[in-house]
Amino acid sequence: MHLTCLSLPAPDCLRRAIIPTRDDLPPLPPGQAAHLCATAPIACGDDTAIPVAQWAGRMPIAHAALRARDHGAWHGRALHDLPAPDVARWIADPDFAPPDGESLRAVLVRAADWLSRCPTGHANMMVIADTMVIRALVLATLGTGAEAFAALDIGPCTRTLVTFHNRWRVREAGAAITF
């Protein structure tokens, strides 16, 4: 089985160091993605199912486990407006969660759980998700966790390929794609 993971473009607000709101969906490139999506089943976060469906030309399978990180009360706030010690912990401590939000470790656990339950009977499948979720899937494939998160650089608008033959393997990570 081949699991092709496409990382979504970054929301525009990130360029201004503002944490996206829950409704801040990344701008998907114009036009259809037929050449990328082919006929493989598409999975995505339940937070992006509608725009992904419009972009891909068909309805994806929405999974809560593939949604972007929940930043709780920090959604829509500029980093410079948040308490500096909390921002430092948010960056350095995988167990830190913003108020009413989710820790990095929680994202890693839910992505790893999804991967462990991913049906491997398909010849191909596609995941379209936030870069953090794609990184979490790669870490789960490698059998590592939060300690390796900062060492893995997978940017927006990239392709990552993992395969399954008795176990998950990373074939390609963070390759640039053209829409």
Predicted regions and their residues:
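Acidic, low-complexity terminal tails and accessory targeting/binding regions
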Residues: 1-3, 69-81, 139-179
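Loop-to-helix element that buttresses phosphate recognition and phosphoryl-transfer chemistry
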Residues: 1-51, 99-111
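Generic beta-sheet signal
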Residues: 3, 121-132
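Phosphate-coordination/substrate-recognition cap region in phosphate-metabolizing enzymes
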Residues: 11-13, 28-87
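Glycine-rich phosphate-binding loop signature in dinucleotide/nucleotide-binding domains
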Residues: 36, 118-123
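Active-site catalytic microenvironments for nucleophilic, acid-base chemistry
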Residues: 55, 117, 140-144
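Short glycine/proline- and acidic residue-enriched helix-loop micro-motifs
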Residues: 86-106
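GST superfamily/GST-like fold recognition
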Residues: 131-135, 164
